[in-house]
């Protein structure tokens, strides 16, 4: 341990000079001084800047024996927190250097650079892994930071395969110019290629490379699917390195009306890199210690005279409850306002700062690729109204914690426990973009102390939806009319919301006639300036205002004329208020969109309970029912994270939805069904109408839903992708207990009839049902991981899944509430066919689909026969028939890249009815990250065979066994084809035992079913809550299992089920 730390220090100090030397243009190259200090459990490197005007940037680069593909860890910006998984022994380089001054006019060079193939170099690391490096097509001396400024431009696609024209290429995405490719076969020739991830990118010439011969494998050693022996120690504990930038100097950028003044230099300060290694002094390191890098910049908030106040991101701990990330407030330049805010981009753009006026200015980077780090484009908000009336006071968003930035903040600190979660959730609320002239004055967003002089109109738009939005920094825009009043905001770094602007919550009621009372702004509505905005609200797509805005902000709700009243969204005002909130189009994230009880129509939502200031902005935000999306009450519930759940409500909400007869509205992907509120998550009493989603409208991809924090030390790591992606707490939905195994088509050539009376999954193992309404008629990506176009059609609905979460049938089925079986005396067989047969598929999950349909009208149906057939197969072959009494059914164990046809036939005791229309669907390619495409002879053959196992399992279905090369038998018992309990045994006839995990909850046990991904498991209890049993256990992948006591005092955990992304038995 000490040696690796010493190496870290040495490398860090050496690379400082290297980092400087190579990146600066010829001429003067300033050096950086570093102060190194060591205490009992931490190493502190304090990098001193040559001058106060210099900002620093850097990254952590790892090399070592068993390096993961994500060996490039860029340090997060602006107080953000990220986690990465690293090996304990390898060496890491810390590279820090002065950042080049940003060029306001520099655009991503990817669009203009010539299309030339990259130069690829491949080197050997171990018998099963190689190191790839390729050349930039531009001069890295001047473009070193470009990858972080052009997230969609600086990614590369690597492809490789065994040298054989018949083999399929395996693809990986990489954010850096080098990566490690692992899990290769020893002594085998592979072909490698790389290309820039931009339109028209050209593949490099094929590079042939032969892996080296591996040494003999050690008996009983458990490895990845390949059986070669890695030249690494059998036991390599991994450590989690949380990387946090604690405080970063914020840059104030002020734009004067038309002329841009040079950006103000940030105050000087030091950046601290803390390497905290808790296990350093422990004699035995049982749990991997975590290294924490925190880079903090002296908190120097400067109140840019009356214009911009830079608010340092505060909060050193990952929980960062209130970081006001850096709102660099830009004084808006008056921009001509055009009424149509391009809504389309507004949504995606991550930082679009919607100048409240019509033209939301969208930052180019907006497109944020999934978890791309949105680079906080500075959203310069422009003054929205030309009308001088509004005084420009710079909205000092300061205190308002740049809500845009940290969406995270908004969540009550408590929820912020998984940092990422919170942020994703809140952001969505959209900022009401007020159409045309509507001068909305928002009360100065919250200036804490001053009630906000004059109304400032800024709506920070913070857009939205990125999975872990890097805090977009929205600069609150201030309307620039003359006379800028600079409210004196108290500079306290964190928003004190103490008197949230008293109020001016002005709602712009479009038809001024009924001013709504301010949405709950805590303080009294204040003079409701309801300026009346011209009625045409319709263009108001307004980007979503992050809810985090301190409420006062204005709940501007344009109660525009009812015309679009898209969702009941809380329209409080009787005149069909269309809460701006839900612009029709932007489909604000409105989580759940059922905005709070519509009933409180005339009254502002006050129920919201204006949170006490201490409630962290979160509440305030919530408060803003402005975004009524947040169900108001949620503020009280710490669990808000779920609440906010960015599940984007469907694009447009139509209030007219007809509630389903079943007790819960059945949310049907197909046409207009109301998303059903799942009682568990939302406190909000939903009013009778639920917004419905229109089938055809295409919704922007929704950010992954936050999930409860998982495994102690580490999140799934095997995903190739942007740096830091591993740190995103996988945002997959929380799984609920298994749904009774739904029979799947089996591989036998004959027809099999299986009844699959589905039982609703009930919350078990601590899981909670969520109100999930994320069906979309189009996939978020047009192609699957291997580049094949995804199947689209009027009868197909997509559900987005985070890339690093395993596929889950149980979670997907939660979107379909159970309906009570029809009771009634049938007088004749059903006369009408089921209608609206829809195929619901989860992106990245080719092994199953969920069929959903409407029951025949005026017929008594007691069960349905679901017929699934592989296209091109003759009658009776590859055909499956399932029986269910629900109006949906899961078809499992489908083959990748295969076309299927589905039909549904209604039945009752008197006979069968006419069959529904036939719908077709083609599954996507298999995910190469889940398991290796095995060649003939190496397949693990799962044999259905009962075995004697421990009863600690939620899965009660069929049992399968397979023999593995490491001389153990693996047994699984199914909940469904993607959720099962895994056991190990020394003999086929002996007892099969639970598998314990010394440092997690069995996430890496997916290796036993040949999955490369870390899976999801449940029920995750601490060992002292588990009975002591005998079983196998280990701490990390690749380590041989041991046999002994698990549970109880042993600190070894075991679980009731696993979801690994691999289907069992895997054949149809």
UniProtKB/Swiss-Prot annotation:
Residues 326-339, 447-462, 603-631, 737-750 have a biased composition (Low complexity). One of its GO terms (cellular component) is extracellular region. Residues 315-351, 384-811 are annotated as: Disordered. It is found in: Secreted. Residues 1-21 form the signal peptide. SUPFAM superfamilies: Fibronectin type III. Gene3D superfamilies: Immunoglobulins (2.60.40.10). It comes from the Eukaryota. GO terms for biological process: extracellular matrix organization; positive regulation of cell-substrate adhesion. Residues 116-214, 833-926 form the Fibronectin type-III domain. Residues 463-473 have a biased composition (Basic residues). Expressed in brain, heart, lung, liver, pancreas kidney and placenta. Keywords: Disease variant, Glycoprotein, Repeat, Secreted, Signal. Glycans are attached at residue 37. The keyword Secreted applies. SMART domains: FN3. Residues 532-544 have a biased composition (Pro residues). InterPro entries: FN3_dom, FN3_sf, Ig-like_fold, TARSH/FNDC1_C. Probably interacts with ABI3. PANTHER family: TARGET OF NESH-SH3, TARSH-RELATED FIBRONECTIN DOMAIN-CONTAINING. It is linked to Defects in ABI3BP has been found in a patient with isolated coloboma, a defect of the eye characterized by the absence of ocular structures due to abnormal morphogenesis of the optic cup and stalk, and the fusion of the fetal fissure (optic fissure). Isolated colobomas may be associated with an abnormally small eye (microphthalmia) or small cornea. This is Target of Nesh-SH3. It comes from Homo sapiens (Human).
């Amino acid at each position: 341990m000490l040696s690796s730390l010493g190496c870290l220090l040495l490398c860090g100090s050496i690379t400082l000079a290297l980092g400087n030397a190579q990146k600066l243009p010829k001429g003067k190259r300033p050096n950086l001084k570093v102060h190194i200090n060591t205490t009992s459990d931490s190493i502190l490197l304090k990098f001193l800047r040559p001058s106060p005007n210099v900002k620093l940037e850097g990254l952590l680069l790892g090399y070592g024996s068993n390096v993961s593909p994500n060996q490039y860890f860029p340090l997060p910006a602006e107080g953000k927190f990220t986690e990465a998984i690293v090996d304990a022994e390898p060496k890491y380089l810390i590279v820090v250097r002065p950042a080049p001054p940003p060029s306001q006019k520099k655009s991503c060079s990817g669009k203009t650079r010539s299309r030339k193939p990259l130069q690829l170099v491949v080197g050997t690391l171990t018998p099963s892994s190689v190191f790839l490096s390729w050349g930039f097509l531009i001069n890295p001396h001047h473009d070193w930071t470009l990858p972080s400024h052009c997230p969609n431009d600086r990614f590369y696609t690597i492809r490789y395969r065994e040298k054989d024209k018949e083999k399929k290429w395996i693809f990986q995405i990489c954010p850096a110019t080098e990566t490690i490719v692992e899990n290769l076969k020893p002594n085998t020739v592979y072909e490698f290629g790389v290309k820039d991830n931009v339109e028209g990118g050209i593949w490099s010439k094929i590079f042939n490379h032969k892996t080296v011969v591996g040494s003999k494998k050690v008996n009983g050693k458990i490895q990845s699917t390949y059986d070669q022996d890695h030249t690494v120690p059998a036991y390599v504990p991994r450590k989690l390195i949380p990387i946090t930038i604690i405080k970063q100097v914020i840059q104030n950028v002020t734009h004067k009306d038309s002329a841009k003044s040079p950006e103000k230099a940030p105050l000087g300060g030091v950046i601290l890199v803390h390497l905290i290694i808790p296990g350093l002094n422990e004699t035995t390191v049982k749990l991997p210690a975590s290294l924490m890098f925190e880079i903090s910049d002296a908190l120097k908030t400067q109140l840019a005279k009356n214009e911009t106040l830079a608010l340092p991101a505060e909060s050193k701990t990952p929980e960062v409850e209130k970081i006001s990330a850096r709102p660099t407030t830009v004084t808006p330049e008056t921009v001509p306002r055009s009424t149509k805010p391009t809504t389309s981009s507004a949504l995606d753009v991550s930082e679009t700062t919607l100048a409240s006026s019509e033209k939301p200015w969208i930052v180019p980077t907006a497109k944020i690729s999934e978890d791309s780090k949105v680079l906080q484009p500075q959203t310069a908000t422009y003054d929205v109204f030309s009308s001088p009336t509004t005084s420009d006071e710079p909205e000092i968003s300061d205190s308002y914690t740049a809500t845009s930035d940290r969406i995270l903040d908004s969540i009550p600190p408590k929820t912020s426990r998984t940092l990422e979660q919170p942020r994703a959730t809140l952001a969505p609320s959209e900022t009401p973009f007020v159409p045309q002239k509507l001068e909305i004055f928002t009360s100065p967003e919250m200036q804490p102390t001053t009630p906000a002089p004059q109304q400032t109109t800024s709506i920070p738009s913070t857009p939205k939806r990125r999975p872990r939005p890097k805090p977009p920094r929205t600069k609150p825009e201030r309307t620039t009319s003359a006379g800028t009043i600079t409210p004196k905001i108290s500079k306290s770094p964190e928003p004190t919301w103490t008197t949230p602007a008293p109020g001016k919550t002005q709602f712009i009621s479009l038809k001024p006639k009924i001013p709504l009372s301010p949405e709950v702004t805590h303080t009294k509505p204040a003079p409701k300036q309801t300026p009346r905005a011209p009625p045409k609200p319709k263009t108001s797509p307004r980007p979503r205002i992050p809810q985090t805005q301190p409420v006062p902000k204005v709940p501007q709700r344009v109660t525009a004329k009812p015309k679009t009243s898209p969702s009941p969204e809380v329209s409080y005002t009787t005149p069909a208020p269309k809460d701006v909130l839900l612009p029709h189009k932007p489909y604000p994230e409105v989580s759940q969109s059922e905005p709070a009880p519509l009933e409180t129509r005339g009254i502002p939502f006050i129920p919201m309970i204006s949170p006490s200031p201490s409630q962290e902005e979160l509440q305030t935000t919530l408060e803003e029912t402005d975004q009524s999306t947040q169900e108001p009450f949620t503020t009280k519930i710490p669990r808000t994270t779920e609440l906010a759940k960015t599940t984007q409500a469907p694009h447009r909400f139509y209030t007219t939805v007809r509630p389903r007869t079943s007790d819960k509205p059945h949310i049907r992907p197909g046409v207009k069904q109301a998303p059903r509120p799942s009682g568990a998550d939302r406190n909000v009493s939903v009013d009778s109408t639920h917004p419905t989603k229109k089938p055809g409208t295409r919704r922007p991809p929704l950010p992954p839903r936050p999930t409860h924090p998982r495994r102690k030390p580490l999140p799934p790591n095997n995903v190739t992708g942007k740096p830091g992606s591993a740190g995103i707490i996988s945002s997959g939905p929380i799984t609920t207990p298994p749904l009774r195994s739904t029979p799947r088509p089996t591989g036998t050539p004959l027809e099999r009839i299986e009844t699959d009376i589905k039982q609703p999954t009930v919350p078990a193992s601590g899981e909670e049902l969520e109100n999930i309404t994320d069906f979309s008629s189009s996939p978020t990506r047009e192609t699957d991981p291997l580049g094949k176009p995804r199947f689209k059609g009027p009868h197909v609905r997509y559900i987005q899944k985070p890339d690093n979460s395993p596929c889950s049938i149980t979670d997907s089925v939660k979107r379909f509430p159970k309906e009570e079986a029809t009771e009634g005396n049938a007088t004749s067989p059903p006369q009408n066919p089921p209608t609206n047969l829809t195929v619901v598929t989860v992106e990245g999950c080719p092994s199953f689909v969920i069929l959903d349909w409407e029951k025949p009208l005026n017929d008594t149906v007691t069960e349905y026969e679901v017929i699934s057939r592989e296209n091109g197969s003759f009658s009776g072959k590859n055909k499956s028939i399932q029986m269910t009494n629900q109006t949906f059914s899961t078809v499992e164990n489908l083959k990748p890249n295969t076309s299927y046809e589905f039909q549904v036939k209604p039945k009752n005791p008197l006979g069968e009815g006419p069959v529904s229309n036939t719908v077709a669907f083609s599954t996507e390619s298999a995910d190469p990250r889940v398991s290796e495409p095995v060649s003939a002879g190496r397949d693990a053959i799962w044999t259905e065979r009962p075995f004697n196992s421990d009863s600690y399992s939620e899965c009660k279905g069929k049992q399968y066994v397979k023999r593995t090369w490491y001389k153990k038998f693996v047994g699984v018992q199914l909940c469904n084809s993607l959720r099962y309990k895994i056991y190990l045994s020394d003999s086929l006839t002996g007892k099969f035992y639970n598998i314990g995990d010394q440092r997690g909850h069995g996430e890496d046990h997916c290796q036993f079913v040949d999955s490369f991904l870390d899976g999801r498991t449940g029920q995750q209890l601490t060992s002292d809550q588990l009975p002591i049993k005998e079983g196998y256990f280990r701490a990390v992948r690749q380590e041989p299992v041991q046999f002994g006591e698990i549970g109880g005092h042993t600190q070894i955990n075991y679980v009731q089920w696993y979801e690994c992304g691999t289907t069992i038995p895997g054949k149809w």
